Amino acid sequence: MKILVTGGGGFLGQALCRGLVERGHQVLAFNRSHYPELQVMGVGQIRGDLADPQAVLHAVAGVDAVFHNGAKAGAWGSYDSYHQANVIGTDNVIAACRAHGIGRLVYTSTPSVTHRATHPVEGLGADEVPYGEDFQAPYAATKAIAEQRVLAANDASLATVALRPRLIWGPGDQQLVPRLAERARQGRLRLVGDGSNKVDTTYIDNAALAHFLAFEALAPGAACAGKAYFISNGEPLPMRELVNQLLAAVGAPRVDKAISFKTAYRIGAICERLWPLLRLRGEPPLTRFLAEQLCTPHWYSMEPARRDFGYVPQVSIEEGLRRLKASSAA
């Protein structure tokens, strides 16, 4: 089968491409840049922007299914830039699937679409948690819009499903763990609150596996068609324990210092005002959204994913940490 993966050059995107090739599929990746890693895998590459409808239409031509993983992620930036990539880009993918008669669309979403300030989510499935309101971050806001459009597009000719993997980590990660480690080594990392809030994470192989299983089960009228699912390792840990285990795996110093949520929230608000005012580059070290995320319990039920497409995490956190440590030492 010929499959297109949008955002195939990213951390999860490369895992999806690699796994699909291993499963015997012909894989194309749609990215804004060329990735030598994909070339080594034997993955075809098409360069373009998700916000360009003609580029997306061209990329989708001739494929049998689409994994729409491409997105603008992050905790900072203009709403329009996120809207163009995440909402308009998703609209373009759906339209291209319609135009070319594609039958299956697997969408990579995020648990952040249900973010509601410091309201906890503990042990619930996606159908038990409403979408968020008054988002403090354009990423979460635009991903929520995009997810709803993907699910609304599900019908007899195009089967769709949305997966919400939580905090993906593992060897090859260039974002989550490297940023934590850098700040820890600089003595700039702090916990928000007492660090007792339990959170879910997802080892990279498990995140990819969930996509493959959902894809294989997806068809018009299938149990997973038109639905969203939280995805994780199903092993929630207190934030303090999680962060320090990840830091230890990459040889970074542990973090014990903490600031209160109120202090973190105020710092985030100040950063959000100063960054555009002073025209500072990059992302601020803290935002209101991040402050809320870092102190709030977020862990989910894997039962819906197990029931509807057989998802059972294959790599435990303990084994994932061992693999991360080995890759860091290599």
Curated annotation (Swiss-Prot):
Active-site residues per Swiss-Prot or TrEMBL entry: Y139 (proton acceptor)
Residues binding NADP(+): K143
The EC number(s) this enzyme carries: 1.1.1.412
Keywords: NADP, Oxidoreductase
SUPFAM superfamilies: NAD(P)-binding Rossmann-fold domains
GO molecular function annotations of the record: oxidoreductase activity, acting on the CH-OH group of donors, NAD or NADP as acceptor
Catalysed transformations (reactions): a (2R,3S)-2-alkyl-3-hydroxyalkanoate + NADP(+) = an (R)-2-alkyl-3-oxoalkanoate + NADPH + H(+)
Pfam families: 3Beta_HSD
A Gene Ontology biological process term: steroid biosynthetic process
Subunit structure: Homodimer.
Assigned protein family: Belongs to the 3-beta-HSD family.
Function: Involved in olefin biosynthesis. Catalyzes the reversible stereospecific NADPH-dependent reduction of 2-alkyl-3-oxoalkanoic acids to 2-alkyl-3-hydroxyalkanoic acids. In the oxidative direction, syn-2-decyl-3-hydroxytetradecanoic acid is the preferred substrate. In the reductive direction, (2R/S)-2-hexyl-3-ketodecanoic acid is accepted as substrate.
PANTHER family hit by this protein: BIFUNCTIONAL POLYMYXIN RESISTANCE PROTEIN ARNA (PTHR43245), SHORT CHAIN DEHYDROGENASE_REDUCTASE FAMILY 42E, MEMBER 2 (PTHR43245:SF51)
Entry protein name: 2-alkyl-3-oxoalkanoate reductase
Organism: Stenotrophomonas maltophilia (strain K279a)
Gene (UniProt): oleD
